[in-house]
Structures are given as structure tokens and as C-alpha cells.
Amino acid sequence: MAENSGRAGKSSGSGAGKGAVSAEQVIAGFNRLRQEQRGLASKAAELEMELNEHSLVIDTLKEVDETRKCYRMVGGVLVERTVKEVLPALENNKEQIQKIIETLTQQLQAKGKELNEFREKHNIRLMGEDEKPAAKENSEGAGAKASSAGVLVS
């Protein structure tokens, strides 16, 4: 019987834990958001480089005779085409890449807002961040100390 009451106590404790988020859960959520933001930024930077490459190739091919042979990598296979065939496809790809970059930029801005709201909601301070506002809150008294207990993330 003592074992059953011990188990009931543990399960009710874990139920209470679901209502209040622990510091580890807050840090994990914050790090997840930061990682998602980094992923979006990385993908946007990669597409920017690809866009620059497309622009360079398009500019070069515009100066060349349309009947000249050129080679294009399609699905890992090098295909022989003419400039006349390749140029419209490259320009179309460039436009699509620009649209994707715009979408990623909007997603990146939205993720930044979400990250800032999460920081404010959970009172998250990054290491090395200015700690003067926290010092002012702590000097106000014990009540302020309890409410300003935030999470420090490295």
C-alpha cells in the first residue's frame, strides 16, 4: 500500500510540472527557436550565393552566340545544350530563387519576433548581455527578486 501512495505522489507531481515550465524546458525551447532561426538564415545565405552564381552565368551567356554549345548539370548528369535552350531556364530558375529568398526572409523576420516574444515571456538573458536592468530590479526588494528570476542562456 505504501508503494501505491508513493506512485500516486509522483504522478501528481509530474502533472503539476506540466502547468509550470521548468528552466530546462524554457532553455530547450529557446535553443530550438534559435536553431530554427539559424537554419533559415543559413538556407537564405546559401540561396543568395546560388542567385549570384545564376546572375554571373546569365550575364556571361548573354554575351555569347545563341547557337554555341554549353553544358548544364541536370540531376547529376552533364547535358549538352545550346545557349538558346539554357538561358531561359536559367532566368526562370533565378526568378524562382528570388521568390524563395523573399519567403525565407519573411519567415526569418517572423522567427525573430517569436524568439524575442519568447525571451520576454520567460525573462531570458543571454550571457554577456547588459545586466544593469536586472541589478535595478534586485535592489527594489525581495518581491522584485522573486518576479525577476529569469533564465540565463549561454
Curated annotation (Swiss-Prot):
Keywords: Chaperone, Cytoplasm, Mitochondrion, Nucleus
Chain intervals for the UniProt region annotation (Disordered): 124-154
Subcellular location: Nucleus; Cytoplasm; Mitochondrion
Main location: nucleus
Low complexity bias locations: 140-154
Any Gene Ontology biological process: positive regulation of cytoskeleton organization
Residue stretches of biased makeup (Basic and acidic residues): 124-139
SUPFAM superfamilies xref list: Prefoldin
UniProt KW tRNA processing keyword: no
GO CC, one annotated term: nucleus
Molecular function (Gene Ontology), one example: unfolded protein binding
Role played: Binds specifically to cytosolic chaperonin (c-CPN) and transfers target proteins to it. Binds to nascent polypeptide chain and promotes folding in an environment in which there are many competing pathways for nonnative proteins.
PANTHER family tied to this protein: PREFOLDIN SUBUNIT 2
Family as reported in the entry's similarity comment: Belongs to the prefoldin subunit beta family.
Record's subunit section: Heterohexamer of two PFD-alpha type and four PFD-beta type subunits. Component of the PAQosome complex which is responsible for the biogenesis of several protein complexes and which consists of R2TP complex members RUVBL1, RUVBL2, RPAP3 and PIH1D1, URI complex members PFDN2, PFDN6, PDRG1, UXT and URI1 as well as ASDURF, POLR2E and DNAAF10/WDR92. Interacts with URI1; the interaction is phosphorylation-dependent and occurs in a growth-dependent manner.
Protein name as catalogued: Prefoldin subunit 2
Natural source organism: Homo sapiens
